[in-house]
């Protein structure tokens, strides 16, 4: 199978806790924190590991929080290729409120990357073998301009590395401007921004996705449609997969789980239909969990079997 790598420029060490209720000024008693790796590409690599595959996570790691992050990934059998960073890896906080069932996500700025640290990450990427898949996901940290990221994607493509970009806004537009991106996964609102018009009907969404494929910007576009599942388009096919009704607990890990599952199928040279089905299954499986947990292998396989009937 084709080897998979992920790139996360702004990784995080995520801590989750529970408190009975939230109110201002007073001390809020919380449960002991649970620590998990965080960051777009890292979570994609974790989802792939949960599903029985393997992806090497490339990222900067700094300070004690960076060491803790690397240790947690080792516990999940996720191979890593890290660059030592001067600034400590950021730490995010997720709080679940028992009384209301609400979740609060406190997201810190990514640790700044200097030019030398980015250059080392670039070297890690350009050592990837031709034909391998690289998933670029997550936000840009301070010190890294969008131009640097697009130059890295272009350089990787010239070496035969197949790039998947899971981003939004200017970063997604800039990546598509390079062209020949293996896969993008915008939601309907993001797709509307990409084609610069409102998309109100299902056929509008399909046509917009096909425009991006036909223009050569991306080989595959999978539009996330929330409860309506996802619409997948390539040069020859168009398919919509609607998930079964499930008791959703949290949507936090759904997107990264979906990208991980689709990447795994892409590495297996599966059809567009199989890829979208497996992605929707993993995304739905992730919503069964509370907090920030990703998809599980068993839940994903059960939903995938249901969708494949």
From Swiss-Prot:
Positions annotated to bind substrate: 12-14, 27-29, 39-43, 90-92, 139, 256
Keywords assigned: ATP-binding, Glycolysis, Kinase, Magnesium, Metal-binding, Nucleotide-binding, Potassium, Transferase
Active site: 256
Assembly: Homodimer.
Binding-site positions, ATP 2: 27, 187-189
Residues noted as binding K(+) in the record, renumbered to the chain: 250, 252, 286, 289, 291, 293
Similarity comment text for this entry: Belongs to the carbohydrate kinase PfkB family.
Name this protein carries in UniProt: ATP-dependent 6-phosphofructokinase isozyme 2
Pfam short name (any one): PfkB
Role summary: Catalyzes the phosphorylation of D-fructose 6-phosphate to fructose 1,6-bisphosphate by ATP, the first committing step of glycolysis.
One cellular-component annotation, GO: cytosol
Residues given in the record as Mg(2+) binding sites: 190
Note: Only 10% of the activity present in the wild-type strain is phosphofructokinase-2. This enzyme is not to be confused with 6-phosphofructo-2-kinase which is also called phosphofructokinase 2.
InterPro entries recorded: Carboh/pur_kinase_PfkB_CS (IPR002173), PfkB_dom (IPR011611), Ribokinase-like (IPR029056), Tagatose/fructose_Pkinase (IPR017583)
EC number: 2.7.1.11
Enzyme's top EC category: transferase
Cofactor: Mg(2+)
Source organism per UniProt: Escherichia coli (strain K12)
Alphabetical GO biological process terms: DNA damage response; glycolytic process
GO molecular function terms listed in the Swiss-Prot or TrEMBL record: 6-phosphofructokinase activity; ATP binding; identical protein binding; magnesium ion binding; protein homodimerization activity; tagatose-6-phosphate kinase activity
Record-listed ATP 1 binding positions: 27, 185-187, 224-229, 248, 280, 284
Regulation of this protein's activity per its record: Allosterically inhibited by ATP. Allosteric ATP-binding requires the presence of the substrate ATP. Inhibited by monovalent cations with ionic radii larger than Na(+) (e.g. K(+), Cs(+)). The monovalent cations increase the affinity of the allosteric site for ATP. PFK-2 is sensitive to inhibition by fructose 1,6-diphosphate.
Catalytic activity: beta-D-fructose 6-phosphate + ATP = beta-D-fructose 1,6-bisphosphate + ADP + H(+)
Pathway in which the depicted protein is active: Carbohydrate degradation; glycolysis; D-glyceraldehyde 3-phosphate and glycerone phosphate from D-glucose: step 3/4
